[in-house]
Every structure is written in structure tokens, then in C-alpha cells.
Amino acid sequence: ATHAVQSTYGYEYQGDNLLLARVNLLLTYAEHLQARWQRKPTKEELQPIATIISWNLWQMDGLRLSVPGGKPQPETEQLDLFSMFGAAEPQPPTVSCKVKNWRKGSHGTAQNFETIQEGSTSMKFDYVIGNPPYQISDGGASVSATPIYNRFIEAIKTTHPGAICLIIPAKWYSGGKGLDKFREEMLGDRHISTLVDYSNSLDVFPNVDVAGGVCYFVWKEAYNGKCKYTNYRNGKATTVYRDLNEFQTFIRYPVASEIVKKVKEDGEL
């Protein structure tokens, strides 16, 4: 379990989100110990794990690869003739972020995060899990908004992670502005081992109504085969193993797809 924590890295800009991530990772370690040995961890066991987590989950501006140096904007003040052309406030110096390689030395060896980005050390994402932004509004009705979750998925795949698990709108099955190529690639991707579909988004997000429902998928680099597809509709789950692109148009409901398949086999379609 300690090695698993040592191998888990991540950064976050917002301090409150960082705190939540650290707490959740520490709780995961404690829950594992409870499940494995049927006891709670001691303070002596938690202290080194907390130290590892404080190093491995850090606060960083991902665009600058540095410690966030911003501060809240001051309240608007009335300008006067003598202050409006004053000297610009100097920017704080950039502070590099450091991470530790816990496999080197008894207490790990620290190195600048930039050196990892520059390729001096190979960096690979084992798992990518999340809920990416869904769309960008173009000022019109929501139906005309431009999806952007597809861009996140395409970018993530270029990093060749071991596995991806993302929850996104299900509208891409048959619609969505500018999603034709994305739809074709997703339906033909045999690395998608699992696709779980919720016809009603309220089953997942009680306070958010996403038109067309939502879905989450599991993409595995080492997998190549049929997809385990589950559809939730009116509280009932139906699961089948299928090729997502078996029909020219994706059929969402397994019962309907079986009917179409049967009709095609009988030569009546």
C-alpha cells in the first residue's frame, strides 16, 4: 500500500480541492488497512503516509509549472491624475515545484517538475479519471453550444495511459455539434471495454438535467474486444457484450438492437 501511495502523483491549482484530494488519498490508505488487517492505522503508520501525500499531491499552476503566485484582485478605486500613471507593480518571482522519487534514497530524492516535463525522466499516466467540461456556449440556445469533452478525450489518448474512465454526455451516440469524426472513432474503438449509459442524467446527477442522458466509459490500452455495454432506463439495467459500431446508427437500447439484429439475420430488413 505504501508503494501504491508513493506512485500516485497529482497537482491542483485550487487549495481547497488539493486538501480534499489529500484527505481522500489518506482515507483510501486507511480503508485498505482496515479491509486487509481488520484494524485502524496507528498514528505512527499514518504520519509517513501523510508526508508522502503532501509531496505527491501539490499545488501548482499547470500553465506555468510553478507555485501559484496570484492574489485576489483589489477593489476598484477611483483613479486620479497622479496615480493612474504610476509604476507597474512588480510580478512575484516564479517558484518551481518539486516532486520526489521515493525509490531513490531513504527519504526520496526531490527534483524540479520542469525536468520531468522536459523529458529527463519518462512520465506516464497509468489512469485518467474525471468529469471533463461538456461544452462552450456560443451565446445561443443550449442546443447550439459546441461540445469540448471530445477534445479532452482525444488529447488524453495521445498520452497513451493504461486506462481512461470519464463521464460525459451521451448525446455523442447520434448527434452533437461537430462530433461526426469523434463518434466514428469512439464507436470503432475496441479499446473501450465498458460503456455504461444512463438515459436519464438525473439518475447520476440529481440536480442536473443533461439532454440525452450521460454515460461513462472505460478505455484500456491493453484491451481489444467487444464492449460490455449497460443501459439504465426507468431504474432497470440491461447488459450485453457488443461491437459498438455493429449498425450504421448506434442503437442505444439493447432490446431494440437485438430485434434489429434478428430481423437482419432473417433477411427481412
Predicted segments — roles?
Residues 1-195, 200-204, 209-216, 220-234:
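SAM-dependent methyltransferase catalytic region
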Residues 207-269:
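Flexible, glycine-/basic-rich loop-and-beta segments that form/coincide
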